[in-house]
């Protein structure tokens, strides 16, 4: 923010171009529907059929106006807490496997989120981070619903992968994750109240099921451009999916790499167990390239399938399962297990 002095000695504050743009977004956001979020002072804003924190909505508008996707870019798409960190690690390891010796891979020293920037967060608010200064980097990520993606992404023809997860585990992973957030908006709502809001679609980037369905429909319309994956299936047997992901990205493993077990090495490097136990992802360590509201360790809780059973009652589970059946009925999604 700049200031100048007028002839009568008064000071006039002039906004930077970025601040002017942000104010334009904020003025528009102020006109949109609002609802209380999962914390006493958290306000969510409805836009495009989904709920947003104001800063994320500003980031969306900034990305829509300024992000320039290239045909060679690759986008990791997901709803929060559905396997994003794992998928970021895998895509980074696949793309960069010939650049580093096994022992020198940057994933061993830094959190995966530092290498695959969010278009609505990193690009919008932290444009000077290293990865965004590297024009050779083809990897980006987003939680933006498919129908709201920036035009440059839609029109560029760049490929993307989407991962989804059982809503019961997604909710539990999100609720426990939010407990680790450095928030000024008050204590997180109870499990029961948060669950009720999640089921009603009231969550950041929610409704979750609509988020999944949007990418599923896009995948059905253009399967050559979107790879649609299920977390549970990948966790059960990651190797064939890592090979499929690499091939889809245009970085397929060669016969020599197959013989040398390179795909297996990628799976091991990016495994939950490996990443969780790295010094970079332990304790209170945070990413070093920009401010963060979560310690790196927050992204590695259990990584297990079915942990919801330790939290949800049978009635709560049945409620979500019923919503899933209703939302995905006749879409073919529940029969798509890869």
UniProtKB/Swiss-Prot annotation:
The keyword Signal does not apply. InterPro entries: P-loop_NTPase (IPR027417), Sulfotransferase_dom (IPR000863). Inhibited by phosphoadenosine 5'-phosphate (PAP). Keywords: Cytoplasm, Transferase. It is an enzyme of class 2 (transferase). Highly expressed in roots, stems and mature leaves. Low expression in young leaves and flowers. Barely detected in siliques. Belongs to the sulfotransferase 1 family. Sulfotransferase that utilizes 3'-phospho-5'-adenylyl sulfate (PAPS) as sulfonate donor to catalyze the sulfate conjugation of desulfo-glucosinolates (dsGSs), the final step in the biosynthesis of the glucosinolate core structure. Substrate preference is desulfo-2-phenylethyl glucosinolate > desulfo-indol-3-yl methyl glucosinolate > desulfo-benzyl glucosinolate > desulfo-6-methylthiohexyl glucosinolate > desulfo-4-methylthiobutyl glucosinolate > desulfo-3-methylthiopropyl glucosinolate > desulfo-singrin > desulfo-3-butenyl glucosinolate. This is Cytosolic sulfotransferase 16. It comes from Arabidopsis thaliana (Mouse-ear cress).
């Amino acid at each position: 923010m700049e200031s100048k002095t007028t002839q009568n000695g008064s000071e006039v504050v002039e906004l930077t171009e970025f601040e002017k743009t942000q104010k334009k977004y904020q003025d528009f956001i102020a006109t949109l529907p609002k609802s209380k979020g999962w914390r006493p002072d958290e306000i969510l804003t409805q836009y495009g059929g989904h709920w947003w924190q104001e800063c994320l909505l500003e980031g969306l508008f900034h990305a829509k106006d300024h992000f320039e996707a290239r045909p060679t870019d690759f986008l990791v798409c997901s709803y929060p807490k559905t396997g994003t960190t794992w998928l970021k690690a895998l895509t980074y390891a696949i793309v960069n496997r010939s650049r580093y010796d096994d022992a020198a891979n940057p994933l061993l020293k830094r959190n995966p989120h530092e290498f695959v920037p969010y278009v609505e967060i990193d690009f919008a608010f932290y444009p000077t981070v290293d990865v965004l200064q590297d024009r050779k980097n083809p990897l980006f990520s987003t939680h933006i619903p498919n129908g709201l993606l920036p035009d440059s992404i839609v029109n560029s023809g760049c490929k993307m992968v989407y991962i989804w997860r059982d809503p019961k585990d997604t909710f539990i992973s999100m609720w426990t994750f939010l407990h680790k957030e450095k928030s000024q908006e008050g204590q997180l709502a109870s499990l029961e109240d948060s669950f009720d809001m999640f089921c009603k679609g009231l969550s950041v980037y929610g409704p979750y099921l609509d988020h999944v369905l949007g990418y599923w429909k896009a995948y059905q319309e253009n399967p050559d451009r979107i790879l649609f994956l299920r977390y549970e299936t990948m966790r059960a047997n990651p190797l064939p999916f890592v090979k499929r992901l690499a091939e889809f990205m245009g970085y397929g493993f060669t016969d020599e790499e197959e013989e040398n077990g390179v795909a297996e090495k990628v799976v091991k490097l990016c495994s939950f167990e490996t990443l969780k136990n790295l010094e970079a992802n332990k304790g209170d360590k945070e990413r070093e390239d920009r401010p963060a509201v979560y310690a790196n360790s927050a992204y590695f809780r259990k990584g297990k399938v079915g942990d919801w059973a330790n939290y949800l009652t049978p009635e709560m589970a049945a409620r979500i399962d019923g919503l899933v059946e209703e939302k995905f009925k006749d879409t073919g999604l529940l029969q798509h297990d890869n």
